[in-house]
UniProtKB/Swiss-Prot annotation:
UniProt-recorded name of the protein: Small ribosomal subunit protein uS3
Top-rank taxon: Bacteria
Organism: Elusimicrobium minutum (strain Pei191)
A GO-annotated cellular component: cytosolic small ribosomal subunit
Gene Ontology biological process terms, A to Z: translation
Assembly and interaction partners: Part of the 30S ribosomal subunit. Forms a tight complex with proteins S10 and S14.
Family annotation (PANTHER family): 30S/40S RIBOSOMAL PROTEIN S3 (PTHR11760), SMALL RIBOSOMAL SUBUNIT PROTEIN US3C (PTHR11760:SF19)
Domain KH type-2: 38-106
InterPro entries: KH_dom, KH_dom-like_a/b, KH_dom_type_2, KH_sf_prok-type, Ribosomal_S3_C_sf, Ribosomal_uS3_bac-typ, Ribosomal_uS3_C, Ribosomal_uS3_CS
Role according to the record: Binds the lower part of the 30S subunit head. Binds mRNA in the 70S ribosome, positioning it for translation.
Name of the gene this protein is made from: rpsC
Family affiliation: Belongs to the universal ribosomal protein uS3 family.
């Protein structure tokens, strides 16, 4: 099961926290769709900002967006113009009072989503997929990751028949629930068609702790990195 399911979904509430943190007794389907539209808008507008994920919190008529990115300057824009325009557009879309925070990812080489995006960008620039995977693995291990696995699939190198290839270094214990596994995917658009990339990164193991204690630590860490201040606020995330 651990090799088939999304490792983040398998560990939700244990070593992984939710990206959408809210509860609504009514209109939940509509709000879930709204979350999807918010993420699509942000990812489409800031394609070159190296966005890992977008956290969403709701409280009554208030909406808080936390954008986790390796390039906060691209999101904020000159004198905060871009992020302010984004806030206005989100308020118009949702009808809620919106606050937007930018959280800087300090170590992008150990963030699975950013690693997958980087590999796909290199493939789109016609770099060899094997060299891109090898370079990503070296950077991740240098960034103190305990293990990494990368898989690419599609018409690799313009081949007539699609295939899947993967590389792994170190340990990636997908069945161990107390292991903190980061997982990310991305797609590269080439002249031969789409090439998909999946990345698993093993960061650390939580020993001798209950699920409640681990989840409390995760939320405490997010409270430090996600400050509920002004719309152009930037903080640093230590990963």
């Amino acid at each position: 099961m651990g090799h088939k399911i999304n490792p983040k979904g398998l560990r939700l509430g244990y070593t992984q926290d939710w990206q959408s943190r809210w509860f609504a007794p009514k209109n939940m389907p509509a709000l879930i769709i709204e979350d999807k539209r918010i993420r699509e808008l942000i990812e489409e507008r800031f394609k070159m900002a190296a966005i890992s994920f977008v956290g969403i919190e709701r409280a009554g008529a208030f909406l808080r967006i936390n954008i986790h990115t390796a390039r906060p300057g691209v999101v904020i824009g000159k004198k905060g113009a871009d992020i302010e325009q984004l806030r206005k557009d989100l308020e118009k879309m949702t009808g809620s009072k919106t606050f937007v925070n930018v959280v800087e990812i300090k170590n992008p080489e150990t963030d699975a989503s950013l690693v997958a995006q980087s590999i796909c960008m290199q493939i789109e620039k016609r770099a060899h997929y094997g060299a891109a995977m090898k370079k990503a693995i070296e950077k991740a291990l240098a960034g103190k990751a305990l293990g990494i696995k990368i898989m690419v699939s599609g018409r690799l190198g313009g081949a007539e028949i699609a295939r899947t290839e993967w590389k792994r270094e170190g340990r990636v214990p997908l069945h161990t629930l107390c292991a903190e596994i980061d997982y990310g995917t991305a797609e590269a658009m080439t002249i031969s068609g789409k090439i998909g990339c999946k990345v698993w990164i093993f960061k650390k193991t939580h020993f001798a702790k209950s699920p409640k204690e681990i989840l409390h630590e995760l939320r405490k860490h997010r409270e430090v990195t996600e400050t509920p201040s002004g719309s152009a606020e930037t903080v640093t995330e230590a990963k």
